[in-house]
Amino acid sequence: MTSRRQFRRSVLFAGALALAAFSTSPARADRCDDVAKQLATQIDGVKVNFKARNIVYLTHPATKEFSIGCRGQNYSLELFAKTDRKYKPEFLALVANAGALVFTIPKPDVVTGSTRCMKRMGILRGDKVSMRFRRLNMECTRTKTEASIAVTRGKDE
């Protein structure tokens, strides 16, 4: 009789553990998804395209590529945008709006930093410019046909 009770008790205990392990927990949205949805609702023309691993790809008429990266090896958030070599003011406005929302800093700071980075590319400084402005790392790159900007914030900030 004692062995039967011990067996029943152990089976009930194992069943309770299995139920606790496989019970459904509420789905938690990633911060990256939240930021992408916020961008889509607050900036005209931005649409969430798809998510691949830790990158959310977005679309906008002023860009060729537009994405938000979350939790890389050296950064906590990344905003990447690519356009034609001769970028338009709408492109810088989009980067400024998105940067202000993603990194929660004032929009004029992002406008100043991204404009400086894009304007520094040229004969004197080359086609790849890296700079730091208001705790944001900005890297501007251009090729013969495209110009891009990657704005990141380090993990420790």
Residue ranges and their predicted role:
Residues 2-14:
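Bacterial N-terminal signal peptides that target proteins for export
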Residues 13-21:
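Bacterial N-terminal signal peptides
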Residues 24-29:
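Sec/Tat signal peptide C-region and signal peptidase I cleavage site
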Residues 30-74:
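N-terminal secretory signal peptides
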Residues 38-43, 76-81, 124-127, 147-151:
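Extracellular/mature segments of secreted proteins
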Residues 46-57, 107-137:
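Short Gly/Thr-rich strand-loop-strand
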Residues 70-121:
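Long, charged/polar, surface-exposed segments that mediate recognition or autoinhibition
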Residues 128-155:
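Short, exposed beta-strand-loop hairpins at the edges of beta-sheets
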